[in-house]
C-alpha cells in the first residue's frame, strides 16, 4: 500500500537534524571519547582529551556548536519504494531544511556555489544528497555535517588485485600518517573497499555513520577493523597530533563486489567531532 509523505516533513526534520548534529555528539561517540580519556597513556594526550570533553559539555549546556566548522551537509535518504512524496521536489525540500537549520541555528555557512569562483551561498546549501530505494513505506534520513579539515585528508587508492589485503592495510596507514595532526585527531576512519572509483568513496563515507561501538558483521572484515585500529594507535600521532596512544577511536570498513582487474580503496577520515543524526519517518 502506498504511503504519502508531505515533503515539508522532510524539510522540518532536516532543519532540526542540522541543529542537533552540530550541538551534540551521539552516545557512542561520547562513550568512545570518555574511554579514550581513561586509557590514554600520554599525560599531554589525556589533558587534550579532557579538554575536548569539556568542549562537548559546554556545547551541550550553552547550545553552541561543538566545532566552528559546522560542515557541509551530507544527507543520506533511504526511501521506501511504497512512499509517495507530495509537495516540493524532494531535493528542494532537503535543501530548504538545510537552509533553515543553518540560518536559524546560527551555524557557520561554509559552502561556495562554484568551486572555482568561490562565492559563499550564505545558507550552507546545496547539500550533498545520496538516495537509495529500499523496501517498505518509510524514509530513513541520515544527516552528517562534514568538516573539511579531515575531509581534505581523505584519499582514494586504485590498487591492483595483486596488492591484496597487505596493500589495503598499507593504504589505510598511509592515509592516516599523511593526515597526521591536520585531521584533528583522535579520528574516526571510514574505509570503503571494492566497487568502482566513486563507489568505494561512498562506502567510506557511509562507514563514518556507523556507530563506533559496532563492527562489521563479516568476521574477517571485523578482524581487519580491529587490526587497523591497533596499528593506527601505534603510530603515536595522538590527540591533537601532539603524541599519545589515541590516534583513532574507530576504524569502520564497508566492502562491495568489484571488477577482476581492480581493488579500489577509499579512506574517509573524520575528526573526533564525528557528527551524524538518524531519523525515520
What are these model-derived regions, one by one?
Residues 1-281:
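Non-transmembrane, aqueous-exposed alpha-helical and coiled segments at domain scale
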Amino acid at each position: 500500500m502506498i504511503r504519502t509523505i508531505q515533503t515539508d516533513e522532510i524539510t522540518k526534520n532536516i532543519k532540526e537534524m542540522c541543529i542537533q548534529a552540530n550541538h551534540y555528539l551521539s552516545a557512542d561517540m561520547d562513550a568512545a571519547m570518555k574511554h579514550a580519556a581513561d586509557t590514554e597513556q600520554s599525560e599531554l594526550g589525556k589533558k587534550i582529551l579532557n579538554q575536548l570533553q569539556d568542549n562537548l559539555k559546554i556545547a551541550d549546556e550553552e547550545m553552541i556548536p561543538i566545532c566552528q566548522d559546522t560542515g557541509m551537509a551530507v544527507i543520506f535518504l533511504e526511501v521506501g519504494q511504497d512512499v509517495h512524496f507530495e509537495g516540493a521536489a524532494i531535493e528542494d525540500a532537503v535543501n530548504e531544511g538545510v537552509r533553515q537549520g543553518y540560518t536559524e541555528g546560527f551555524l557557520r555557512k561554509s559552502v561556495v556555489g562554484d568551486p572555482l569562483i568561490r562565492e559563499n551561498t550564505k545558507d550552507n546549501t546545496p547539500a550533498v544528497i545520496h538516495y537509495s530505494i529500499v523496501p517498505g513505506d518509510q524514509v530513513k534520513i541520515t544527516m552528517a555535517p562534514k568538516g573539511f579539515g579531515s575531509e581534505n585528508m581523505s584519499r582514494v587508492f586504485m590498487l591492483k588485485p595483486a596488492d591484496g589485503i597487505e596493500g589495503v592495510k598499507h593504504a589505510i596507514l598511509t592515509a592516516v600518517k599523511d593526515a597526521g595532526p591536520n585531521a584533528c585527531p583522535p579520528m574516526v576512519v571510514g574505509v570503503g573497499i571494492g566497487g568502482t572509483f566513486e563507489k568505494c568513496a561512498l562506502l567510506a563515507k557511509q562507514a563514518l555513520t556507523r556507530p563506533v561501538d559496532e563492527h562489521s558483521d563479516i568476521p574477517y572484515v571485523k578482524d581487519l577493523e580491529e587490526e587497523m585500529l591497533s596499528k593506527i594507535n601505534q603510530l603515536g600521532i595522538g590527540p591533537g597530533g601532539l603524541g599519545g596512544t589515541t590516534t583513532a577511536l574507530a576504524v569502520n570498513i564497508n566492502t562491495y563486489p568489484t571488477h577482476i582487474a581492480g581493488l579500489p580503496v577509499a579512506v574517509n577520515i573524520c575528526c573526533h567531532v564525528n557528527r551524524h543524526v538518524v531519523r525515520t519517518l
